[in-house]
């Protein structure tokens, strides 16, 4: 094998909107409300190996806006990407799928959610950038805690 064939390789094969749902259970009455809605945002990342070197990464986002406990709108979206990852050490694959790939996908998700909200007749909502490294590290800590080990090696009771 040549050195070129052994070089680390990372390629975006495709980026696509996998799922999009918008609900307005209280329209048109909700448009008469004068109060600003309270907005909640949830983001999650999933990775699935499709082939030996091919991975699908999905960044899911849910945005819920409520005015006095009445839902103004609920948007759920999944932005996905197919990535070809070769000649990368095994211990670096998980962080690549959990940090780098979601960072690439998130601007697409943010744009699709914002577009859906404005097309539904609501003022635009701009989702802040997400630190996927912090999210990834938090997920690792939760997994370690569920497995019964604390970060310093002690067992939690």
From Swiss-Prot:
GO molecular function: unfolded protein binding
Cited Gene3D superfamilies: SecB-like (3.10.420.10)
GO BP terms: protein folding; protein tetramerization; protein transport
Domain of life of the organism encoding this protein: Bacteria
Subcellular compartments: Cytoplasm
Keywords: Chaperone, Cytoplasm, Protein transport, Translocation, Transport
Coiled coil: none
Pfam families according to UniProt: SecB
GO cellular component: cytoplasm
Family: Belongs to the SecB family.
Function as written in the Swiss-Prot or TrEMBL entry: One of the proteins required for the normal export of preproteins out of the cell cytoplasm. It is a molecular chaperone that binds to a subset of precursor proteins, maintaining them in a translocation-competent state. It also specifically binds to its receptor SecA.
Record text on subunit structure and interactions: Homotetramer, a dimer of dimers. One homotetramer interacts with 1 SecA dimer.
PANTHER family assigned to the protein according to its UniProt record, in alphabetical order: PROTEIN-EXPORT PROTEIN SECB, PTHR36918
Descriptive protein name: Protein-export protein SecB
Lineage summary: Bacteria, Pseudomonadati, Pseudomonadota, Betaproteobacteria, Burkholderiales
Gene: secB
